[in-house]
Amino acid sequence: MTDIKNEEVASEKKSLNFIEQAVEKDLKEGKNGGKVQTRFPPEPNGYLHIGHAKAICLDFGIAEKHGGVCNLRFDDTNPTKEDVEYVEAIKEDIQWLGYQWGNEYYASDYFQQLWDFAIRLIQEGKAYIDEQSSELIAQQKGTPTQPGVESPYRNRPIEESLELFKKMNSGEIEEGAMVLRAKIDMANPNMHFRDPIIYRVVKHPHHRTGTTWKAYPMYDFAHGQSDFFEGVTHSLCTLEFVVHRPLYDLFIDWLKEGKDLNDNRPRQTEFNKLNLSYTLMSKRNLLTLVKEGLVNGWDDPRMPTICGFRRRGYSPKSIHKFIDKIGYTTYDALNDIALLESSVRDDLNSRATRISAVINPVKLIITNYPEGQVEELEAINNPEDPEAGSHLIEFSRELWMEREDFMENAPKKYFRMTPGQEVRLKNAYIVKCTGCKKDENGVITEVYCEYDANTRSGMPDANRKVKGTLHWVSCNHCLQAEVRLYDRLWKVENPRDELAAIREAKKCEALEAMKEIINPDSLKVLPNCYIEKFAATLPPLSYLQFQRIGYFNIDKESTPDKLIFNRTVGLKDTWGKINK
């Protein structure tokens, strides 16, 4: 298993430089006319996850830093898996992260140009129609140490391949009956050079072009040419595309054969993927989670999708902070999710509005406080931000407090509510606990205390020191709310490797393996919580800190009649302590 890596900020910045230095070197040498143009090329077959966010920050960040442009290009070459829903979701996620693309393109914009290029390759003897099955073609490719076997169709007459290629697109040829392959080198050590498939038949309607096309280009054939058509100067990809780069370059060479491309061609550079502990990020696995109901949709706050993080309460800046910390390298590492959560805490500490909420309530009665009296006390919205202002919170004789904040027989260093001990009620008074009431089962139903009227802010004894400060809400001036406590979706540190190991050992499908390692406690719903009324005035997705509990946000499903709050992250990394 890959070691957990938490790199120091200095080394992270240094690791990013290998890409920046390459770009700056090109600019100094006058390549590409001194311009920088990048692209973010997602396939619209699912929702973006935090791994895509790393690529987005690089693609858009490099362009911004050097006064260039980053375009958005949808790699829509597989109509069976693509949908307009995903297109719109991807655009929303990019904008939420704070970026705006220069132009919006689609690989389908170039279908005619790619088709014409494929025709030319057939005419030049560089491509042929192969009627073998996909299984046989794969077998004939050989291994990295053994050369492949040439297809019996490799030298089929050019006119015959041309005629069949046109039939592939006319609808006369069934899916899987034949493919178009580039004629390169079946003995090349790079497996991608062994006559790669560049076109196949897909009869499913395309979300943009309808039924115009039945023959569709493969990724390797469409990607580099699309970069070239758009004038991309720096094509930034993850490490698995290192072995694809020679093919990327070859197709561009063939496309512009006989012309000098040294100073005007896309340059592919690879960086490491984002791997995160306690997280699965393959779209295939995420789709399984959604389809099988193991999560509540793509934006379930337990999902590593950008929309899931947004709903959970992560801010764009917190994701940027995390990506800055891990940097970009040329080797894979498993990054500790605690580093992401730390970035979220750091950011939310400066922006979250502080409010009072009680999630496991027990009634606290101040026996010497006048019945019917209500005071409005000032509560600071954010002590880290003086400009955030304050709001008023009502105080009365009967309050809700956290059940965990009372102990009838407490140890010596217990500084919360216990008989005979004083604590301060946040923003209010110092009180002394006098006892409690229990039901027939011994469950505490009420806690009693007396208050010192001289200890409110501005009073003579306001600065009297006590060791414990507790939060509360007034019973008659609060709102009932549902609180959703989200935790890590997986029980194991590296679910990707664990999933593969289980499937190999049991010869089972992904779903069965997932059920073995999914965390059954990743969501706890608390329906009877109480929160101060001020929270109901805030818009959905507002960043909040429930004092002494953690960071939360208002869920998109929350209504005035049913308030719903999601836990974003705790105030401290309790998971790390539990699992030590």
What residue ranges belong to the model's regions?
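Active-site cores that bind ATP or allylic diphosphates and position pyrophosphate for catalysis
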Residues: 72, 76-78, 84, 106, ...
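N-terminal catalytic cores of NTP/NDP-binding nucleotidyl/phosphoryl-transfer enzymes
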Residues: 14-91, 206-238
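Core subunits and conserved enzymes of cellular information-processing
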Residues: 241, 245, 249-251, 317-320, ...
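Basic/polar N-terminal segments that are highly enriched at the extreme N-terminus
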Residues: 1-14, 580
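Conserved short loop/turn motifs at secondary-structure junctions
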Residues: 41-44, 73-81, 103-112, 135, ...
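Residue-level signal for inorganic ion chemistry
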Residues: 30, 59, 90, 121, ...
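Long, charged, mostly alpha-helical binding arms that flank functional sites
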Residues: 263-343
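A glycine-rich helix N-cap at a beta->alpha junction
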Residues: 86-112, 117-120, 125-128
